[in-house]
C-alpha cells in the first residue's frame, strides 16, 4: 500500500487503536491480542493503530514492540490496515519505524517525542528524519510537546511526500483551522483528543470528519452507531449518545490522570476480552469505578 492509498483510507470512516494484551505477570499476551483483533476487525473500522498511546507504546520494550506489530499485521492481513505507533527520541523513532515497515505495517502514527521540550524547528527536523527513514505513509500527532504550526507542516509536506496525515490532540481550534485551510487536501485529518466522540461534531464542522475511537475497544457497536450518526448529521442521535454514555463515561475517566488508558482496559475486561492490567506508571480503575463502568456499558445493550 503506497502512502496515497493509505491517505485515502484514513480520510473516511472510524479509526481505533486496540489496547495491548498483558498476562497476569504483565508480559505481552499474543493469544489475547489475536482474539481481540479478530473480534474488533469485522465491526468496520477503516484502520487500526497497533502499539499506539492506548496500546501503551510508551511501556513496551523493543522486543515486545516487534511482537505486537507482527501479531497485528499477521492477524489483520486480509481484514483491516494496521498502522504502527512510533515515538521516543529521533533515533529510537527511526528504529521503530523501520521495524514496523519491515514487519508489514501499512503506515505509522508518529507519537510526540517524550518529555523533552524543543523548538518548532527541532520538532520539524525530528518528523522529517522519521519520514525519510521509511517509504510507508506517516501521520504526525500534534499533542503535548509536539505542537507544529501550519508554516512548518507546509514545509514538511513539501519535503516529505510520505507525510500524509495530521492527527490533532491539542484541541486548539485556531491552530486546527489554520492547518486545515493552509494544507487543504494535502493531508488526511484525524481528530485525536481523548474520547474524541465528544468533539466529533465540532471537528466535522472544521473539515475533520474522521477520528479515532477509544471506546471501540469495548463497545464497538455503540462506537460505530455514534460515528454513523455524526456522518449523517443526526444531531438528536448524537446528543442522546453523548448524554446517555459519553458524559457519564467522562465522569469516570476524569477521576484520575492516566485513566484514558486504564478505563479502556477495564471496559475490555467487562466486555469479555480481558487485556490484563495497565503497566506502571498507570494505575487500574478501583473496584467501585469498575462497577460504575460495567453498569454504564450494560445500558448500551449487546455489542
Curated annotation (Swiss-Prot):
Keywords of this entry: Lyase
Entry-linked Pfam families: DHDPS (PF00701)
Enzyme class: lyase
Keyword Lyase: yes
InterPro entries per the UniProt record, alphabetical: Aldolase_TIM (IPR013785), DapA-like (IPR002220), Dehydro-deoxyglucarate_dehyd (IPR017655)
Catalyzed reactions: 5-dehydro-4-deoxy-D-glucarate + H(+) = 2,5-dioxopentanoate + CO2 + H2O
Molecular function per GO: 4-hydroxy-tetrahydrodipicolinate synthase activity; 5-dehydro-4-deoxyglucarate dehydratase activity
Protein name: Probable 5-dehydro-4-deoxyglucarate dehydratase
Pathway(s) this gene product operates in, as recorded in its UniProt entry: Carbohydrate acid metabolism; D-glucarate degradation; 2,5-dioxopentanoate from D-glucarate: step 2/2
Family recorded in the similarity comment: Belongs to the DapA family.
GO biological process: D-glucarate catabolic process
